[in-house]
Amino acid sequence: RADHSIALRADFERSMPHADPQMRALHLGCGAALFNLRVAAQHAGFRPSVKLLPDPDDQQTLASVTLVGASESLDHDLSPLYSAIPERRTSRYPFAERPIPTALENLLVDQARSEGSRMAFLTGWHLQLVLELIEEAELNTEHDGDQDEELWVRTGVTLSDTTGNPVDPAKREDPEDLGMILDGVPEYSLGPRRYGGRAPVRDFARGREHSERDSEMFEHMPHLGLIYTEHDHPVDWLVAGQAMERVLLVATREGLASSFATQALERPELRWLLRDPVWGAGPVQMVIRLGYGPLGSRTPRRDVRDALEILP
């Protein structure tokens, strides 16, 4: 736009009505995208001025960002995270039974706090409770099925053109025809089956045949961090999404692999139990698994032409 502004708009057609009926997770994902935009703007020498939910009557516009010219007010902590954006991936692989240094845990906690959220690493009985809640949610999903999951797990084809036909990238006649990438969870990123350990890795391949998929032992004492906020409204979800992405980018920069454990978050009767009743924190927005291991595979993303509209 001529006024150097960017509107972040939600695509409600891509929501998950069964796992995310309030669209809380959708807001978290958009918050993460907003943080990446802020990092990219800082890297390019602009200061992003952000307003969350700028129009109360427009639920689709989640944020407006105005790019201000370079000045002394640039946040020099954000720009170095730019190179971590393409490297941050979800790893569904085993992590080493190796502690995360306390100094690094404290650094990640500080990153969440700087974005207006809080983060806590789980230990002792609280870690065991959260693992049990996630396992219960996973068992329920195995029994009940997951209609949303079926929409987003990609088996076989990972690329298609705009007609939905399979495309072999090596045989494209027009190098400008990039086709349309099917985003989601492709088969090659599912990771191995877990035959031991307690790492809360979601098995997206349940009920599907994957003969070449190996089984491996996962960590027995996973490192889990909770992202939580004081309240539980759309603006809080956007704040938490930015905090989540900042934590993940810094973790990636520091050599940590990561994944999400959302199973219990998708069941209201279990989500409220995730919080620690002793320190009485606010609602949990995300459970993050961190550790030392493979970063995971690169996965397709929505085509830029399908997600970005430039207005005069």
Show which residues each predicted segment covers.
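Acidic, surface-exposed loops and disordered segments
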Residues: 1-312
